[in-house]
From Swiss-Prot:
The name this protein goes by in its record: Probable Xaa-Pro aminopeptidase SS1G_06948
Enzyme class: hydrolase
One matching Pfam family: Peptidase_M24
GO biological processes: proteolysis
Residues where Mn(2+) 2 binds: D305, D316, E501
Enzyme Commission (EC) number: 3.4.11.9
Record GO terms (molecular function): manganese ion binding; metalloaminopeptidase activity; peptidase activity
Cofactor: Mn(2+)
Lineage summary: Eukaryota, Fungi, Dikarya, Ascomycota, Pezizomycotina
The species this protein was found in: Sclerotinia sclerotiorum (strain ATCC 18683 / 1980 / Ss-1) (White mold)
Keyword rRNA processing carried by entry: no
Superkingdom of this protein's organism: Eukaryota
Protein task: Catalyzes the removal of a penultimate prolyl residue from the N-termini of peptides.
Annotated S-S bridges: none
Record family assignment: Belongs to the peptidase M24B family.
Length: 556
């Protein structure tokens, strides 16, 4: 195959496409002016499909790579079956691949020529026979070109020869995310002439640069990506609202999960960004509780952490509410404290802010509140703060990036506070490791905690009463036990835990809250309106049943 001619042809087609579409600003199609007697010759131009901005994303990656030549090589997820089965799991595309294509079907590979600015998708050959009968036809190259922001679509059988050709004739390395994603069937070594001698050079593949460049690019959301996150957030909000409406007459955590997921599926959001967390009572103290199978009766609070995906983009929302529609004194105190933590931290968000500082402010607010409630005591605020006592009640990071992953990537990987957690550490070391953040100036290398315009992050403070954490770790440690009011804890264990979480877009001079799910008084109002409606429904049913009995008696 003549790849140079193919490249030249795709470049020409790319230039032609720039002038194909002229969308109207006043509707879904635009009309050319015609004489009223010439109506049969009316021409119109359909509104163009809004394509996923794959080329924009590829150019962003090029920018952060800092290279003017080379090739990016990214395989999508291959299709596969469960072990010892002929059934396939639900498909979930590799997110780095999706970021450069918007393509959400298996067995494809994308390449991007940095110096030619050419984005090519490599697809399996057309399927036929029983495969079509069972699974339908694969999209054709023509269909893909019409739908996606690509320069060319080619079939996979030509890929190996293309990569070999590229390695021998084009400048720069072939960049892969991971060594294991390097293609196996390519002539990896390049033979070059040095005078009369043939010298074998190094492999043309490089796995040291691409991941960090893509992480940095993915942290800054394009307008299209923000639109997807807003859509996911809107559907998620409706799921939370429907749970609130029915909460008073639900009996099990499983019903909460069912209502939320059904709401999302009915709105075409068929995938959850993560497993639904519907923890009631003390289950709310388990951060990633997902059993969702226990009764609600007799329990104070529900912590519902749930968010759907829309076209692979996540939302992440947590609401904590009283199951009865009314807070106990202890639950109200903890909810108010967490709400204060969140409100103050959100107000700190803006470009240039260090998320580490926001995170530590949450601990300061938490500690003051816990001291006022008498849950921690026996020292000054500064003494208790430097000891890290608040971590016993607030043991996780304040937030994370949101995007193609619910815990999305950014400069340096994930957001800075997540780097502190090593599940291999001994429990007694957790707090010491956590508070290294106060003194380790090097932990912010790579700028992962510095907020920038168009980042999306969560702010999700929480206060928890985990029996295991408190009784097996902190109360057994002389360093922390002296500060914790063990007797008062007994009153707060039934609260379980409170977490409140919103998704925030960093704007030019501050933030925008993308989360519209009700919280606080607005959530309570929905719960209690649901209770009133249920009570009216029961009264109506009883009245109808009474009338039926009266008619039956009269008839006989």
């Amino acid at each position: 195959m003549d790849f140079r001619s193919l490249i030249a042809s795709s470049v020409a087609q790319d230039k032609d496409r720039e002038f194909e579409v002229r969308p109207s600003s006043r509707g879904s199609w635009s009309c050319k002016e015609v004489d009223e007697f010439d109506a049969l010759s009316i021409e119109y131009e359909p509104k163009p499909i809004e394509k996923y901005p794959a080329k924009l994303h590829a150019r962003q990656v090029k920018k952060y790579l800092g290279l003017q030549e080379g090739l990016i090589y990214l395989p999508g997820l291959p299709s596969f079956n469960y072990e010892d089965s002929d059934m396939q799991p639900a498909f979930r595309q590799r997110r780095y691949f999706y970021y450069l294509t918007g393509v959400n079907f298996p067995d494809c590979i994308v390449t991007y020529s940095i110096h030619r600015d050419q984005l090519w998708l490599w697809i399996p050959p057309p399927n036929s026979g029983r495969s079509v009968i069972y699974n339908g036809s694969r999209p054709t190259a023509k269909e893909i070109m019409a739908k996606y922001d690509l320069d060319h679509v080619e079939t996979l059988p030509h890929l190996d020869s293309y990569l070999t050709w590229y390695a021998h004739t084009e400048p720069g390395k072939i960049h892969v995310l991971h060594d294991y994603q390097t293609p196996n069937n390519v002539e990896l070594q390049i033979t070059r002439k040095n005078g009369s001698q043939s010298i074998m050079s190094e492999s043309p593949f490089d796995s040291t640069k691409l991941e960090e460049a893509m992480n940095t690019a993915r942290a800054i959301k394009s307008p299209y990506e923000l639109k997807m996150i807003r859509k996911a957030s809107a559907i998620t909000a409706q799921g939370h609202i429907n749970v609130l409406r029915g909460l008073r007459y639900l009996s099990n955590e499983a019903e909460i999960e069912a209502i939320f997921t059904a709401t999302c599926i009915a709105r075409q959001a068929k995938t959850q960004a993560y497993g639904v967390i519907a923890g009631s009572g003390e289950n709310a103290s388990t951060l990633h509780y997902m059993a969702n199978n226990e009764p609600l009766k007799g329990r104070q609070l529900l912590c519902l952490d749930a968010g759907c995906e829309w076209d692979c983009y996540a939302s992440d929302v947590t609401r904590t509410v009283p199951i009865s529609g009314e807070y106990t004194e202890e639950a109200q105190a903890i909810y108010d404290l967490v709400a204060k933590m969140q409100d103050e931290c959100i107000e700190m968000l803006k470009p240039g802010a260090n998320y580490r500082d926001v995170h530590m402010h949450a601990h300061k607010v938490a500690l003051r509140g816990l001291m006022e409630l008498g849950l921690v005591e026996g020292g000054t605020f500064n003494e208790l703060y430097m000891a890290g006592v608040s971590v016993a009640f607030f043991p996780h990071g304040l937030g994370h990036y949101v995007g193609l992953e619910v815990h999305d990537v950014g400069p340096g990987g994930m957001i800075i506070t997540n780097r502190l957690f090593d599940f291999n550490r001994k429990p007694a070391d957790w707090t010491d490791a956590y508070f290294q953040i106060l003194s380790d100036s090097g932990i912010n290398s790579g700028g992962g905690a510095i907020l920038s315009k168009d980042m999306v992050v969560t702010v999700e403070p929480g206060i928890y009463f985990s029996r295991y954490a408190l009784e097996e770790v902190y109360l057994k440690s002389p360093k922390y036990a002296k500060y914790i009011n063990k007797e008062l804890l007994q009153k707060y264990y039934p609260v379980g835990g409170v977490r409140i979480e919103d998704d925030l877009l960093i704007t030019e001079d501050g933030y925008e809250n993308l989360t519209t799910a009700p919280k606080g008084e607005a959530a309570l109002k929905i719960i209690n309106e649901g209770r009133e409606q249920e009570e009216k429904r029961v009264v109506c049913e009883k009245a109808a049943e009474s009338k039926r009995k009266q008619k039956k008696t009269w008839f006989w």
